[in-house]
Amino acid sequence: MATPSLRGRLARFANPGKPILKPNKPLILANRVGNRRREKGEATCITEMSMMMACWKQNEFRDEACRKEIQDFFDCSSRAQEARKMRSIQESLGQSESLSPHKMTKLLQRFPNKSHLI
């Protein structure tokens, strides 16, 4: 396809008030948001788990030889579980950084947007 000429490109910039593309839907915000699932986040304790499995492999899967690595992994997983509990408590109390999609939809329905263009 041929490249647009310089005159054609300059003609678009000459009239800044007129949009270049015509939207297929009106540019109005909706009164609800999509109900999507939250991201699960990254996996925790990967390093401890890999150290534990490497120890098992070296010691032919004997728990007695890898007692320290197993304990480190269990400690890390319990800390991660406590952090998840605290985060869920903060979200339920409304102290989280962002609102859930359900709460956002409730707020948008309480304070709806104008449904016509100004």
Curated annotation (Swiss-Prot):
Q: Does the keyword Glycoprotein apply?
A: no
Q: Which domain of life is it from?
A: Eukaryota
Q: Show the segment(s) annotated as Disordered.
A: 86-105
Any single GO BP term: mitochondrial translation
Per UniProt, the short sequence motif Cx9C motif 2 occupies residue numbers 66-76
Q: Where in the cell is it found?
A: Mitochondrion; Nucleus
**Entry-linked Pfam families:** CHCH (PF06747)
> Which residues fall in a compositionally biased region of kind Polar residues?
89-99
Q: Which UniProt keywords apply?
A: Disulfide bond, Mitochondrion, Nucleus, Ribonucleoprotein, Ribosomal protein
Limits of the CHCH domain = 42-84
**What Gene Ontology cellular-component terms does the record carry?**
cytosol; fibrillar center; mitochondrial inner membrane; mitochondrial small ribosomal subunit; mitochondrion; nucleoplasm
Residues of the signal peptide: none
Q: Which cysteines are joined by disulfide bonds?
A: 45-76, 55-66
Motif residue range(s): Cx9C motif 1: 45-55
Subunit structure, as described in the record: Component of the mitochondrial ribosome small subunit (28S) which comprises a 12S rRNA and about 30 distinct proteins.
Q: What protein family is recorded?
A: Belongs to the mitochondrion-specific ribosomal protein mS37 family.
Q: Which PANTHER family match?
A: CHCHD1, SMALL RIBOSOMAL SUBUNIT PROTEIN MS37
This protein is called Small ribosomal subunit protein mS37
Source organism of the structure: Mus musculus
